[in-house]
């Protein structure tokens, strides 16, 4: 596939997803698939929860128009379709966490049993020897599926953030896969971005506040599952184009935020799934930034971490264990900042005041 053909297909996918969103939001309002404001959700009015359904429709359209051979795409669509359906039911009726976890385990088992996708190896992340998981890899894979889905679900807290972080992750994967000649998987990653961008435009209100939509659990579940599916295809096997440790950098911010949040909740004796306002975007907004500024800052941080992962992947002289050590160092720094969020917030507020004062003095002089 040449670049012109890929670009043309991506434009078609973008236009289809945009048109589908406008149609789907009207249907969602009629059937009650909307998000209502409450004590945790500060938006105004009823917002259609159709972002995830639109992304899934866009992916189906992408598979329909491309000539690329996507491995096990029928199984993926069946699993993803089930997750989107259950996610939409949860968006509409707020179903049990146990039911959602069971369905996530079900699609994870199908992915391993039918497609043969599971974590056989962690590569050379722990030294010069390869870390082969053997039968234990099936258990680790189920946990990875659950972790990826919930990591992306938990960052969906302010406008644009889930879409921005998703585009960073799929963009990094797409670049590495394209450079490795894996055109079908690269197209899949770029198609995900093409389906997500229309959602971002509407979610941020860039096409008018009255057209605003949310992703919903259907969308965050789909994005997390798609990310882990592609990463398993790209990091496992003898000729894998991406090292397993690079996957950590690609989804760094969602992963770090999820681990930090769950650790903090468990320490307080709370359920790890109980809602609160302690996510990274909440902490940044408490430091005096707007939700739009928090979205930009977090997305840029995710892009920086993903770029480090991409560079580490390309520079073959850097051992995988060094990349793991650097990631753990970045995670410790993240945890330190989150644990002392009030100090960080106070420092940022003081810095912003000094900058405003300096700017004011400059204008007066």
Swiss-Prot record:
Keywords associated with the record? Cell inner membrane, Cell membrane, Glycosyltransferase, Lipopolysaccharide biosynthesis, Magnesium, Manganese, Membrane, Transferase, Transmembrane, Transmembrane helix
Name the cofactor(s).
Mg(2+); Mn(2+)
Subcellular location as annotated: Cell inner membrane
* GO BP terms: cell wall macromolecule biosynthetic process; cell wall organization; enterobacterial common antigen biosynthetic process; lipopolysaccharide biosynthetic process; O antigen biosynthetic process
Q: Which CDD domains match?
A: GT_WecA_like (cd06853)
| Pathway connected to this protein | Bacterial outer membrane biogenesis; LPS O-antigen biosynthesis; Bacterial outer membrane biogenesis; enterobacterial common antigen biosynthesis
Catalysis performed (reactions) = di-trans,octa-cis-undecaprenyl phosphate + UDP-N-acetyl-alpha-D-glucosamine = N-acetyl-alpha-D-glucosaminyl-di-trans,octa-cis-undecaprenyl diphosphate + UMP
Write down the top EC class of this protein.
transferase
Question: Which family does the UniProt entry place this protein in?
Answer: Belongs to the glycosyltransferase 4 family. WecA subfamily.
Its function, per the record, reads: Catalyzes the transfer of the GlcNAc-1-phosphate moiety from UDP-GlcNAc onto the carrier lipid undecaprenyl phosphate (C55-P), yielding GlcNAc-pyrophosphoryl-undecaprenyl (GlcNAc-PP-C55).
List the PANTHER family hit by this protein, alphabetically.
PHOSPHO-N-ACETYLMURAMOYL-PENTAPEPTIDE-TRANSFERASE (PTHR22926), UNDECAPRENYL-PHOSPHATE ALPHA-N-ACETYLGLUCOSAMINYL 1-PHOSPHATE TRANSFERASE (PTHR22926:SF3)
Designated name of the protein: Undecaprenyl-phosphate alpha-N-acetylglucosaminyl 1-phosphate transferase
User: What's the name of its gene?
Assistant: wecA
């Amino acid at each position: 596939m040449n670049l012109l053909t890929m670009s043309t297909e991506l434009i078609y996918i973008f236009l289809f997803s945009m048109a589908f969103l406008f149609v789907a939001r009207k249907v969602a309002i009629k059937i009650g698939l909307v998000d209502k404001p409450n004590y945790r959700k500060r938006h105004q009015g009823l917002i259609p929860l159709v972002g995830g359904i639109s992304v899934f429709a866009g992916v189906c359209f992408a598979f329909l128009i491309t000539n690329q051979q996507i491995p096990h795409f029928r199984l993926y669509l069946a699993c993803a379709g089930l997750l989107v359906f259950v996610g939409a039911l949860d968006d509409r009726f707020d179903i049990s966490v146990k039911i959602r976890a069971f369905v996530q385990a079900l699609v994870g088992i199908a992915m391993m049993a039918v497609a043969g996708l599971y974590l056989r190896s962690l590569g050379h992340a722990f030294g010069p020897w390869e870390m082969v998981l053997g039968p234990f890899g099936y258990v680790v894979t189920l946990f990875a599926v659950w972790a990826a889905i919930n990591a992306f679900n938990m960052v969906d807290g302010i406008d644009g953030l889930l879409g921005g972080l998703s585009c960073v992750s799929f963009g990094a994967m797409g670049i590495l896969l394209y450079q490795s000649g894996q055109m079908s998987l690269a197209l899949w990653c770029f198609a995900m971005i093409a389906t997500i961008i229309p959602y971002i435009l509407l979610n941020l209100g860039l096409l008018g506040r009255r057209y605003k939509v949310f992703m919903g659990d259907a969308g965050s579940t789909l994005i997390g599952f798609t990310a882990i599916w592609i990463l398993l295809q790209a990091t496992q096997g003898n000729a894998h184009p991406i090292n397993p440790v690079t996957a950590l950098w690609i989804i760094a911010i969602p992963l770090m935020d999820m681990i930090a949040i769950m650790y903090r909740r468990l320490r307080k004796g709370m359920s790890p799934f109980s809602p609160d306002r302690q996510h990274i975007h909440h902490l940044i907004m408490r430091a005096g930034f707007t939700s739009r500024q928090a979205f930009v800052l977090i997305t840029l941080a995710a892009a920086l971490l993903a770029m480090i992962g991409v560079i580490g992947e390309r520079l073959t002289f850097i051992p995988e264990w060094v990349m793991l050590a650097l990631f753990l160092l970045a995670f410790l720094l993240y945890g330190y900042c989150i644990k002392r969020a009030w100090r960080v917030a106070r420092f940022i507020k003081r810095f912003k005041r000094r900058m405003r004062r300096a700017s004011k003095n400059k204008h007066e002089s």
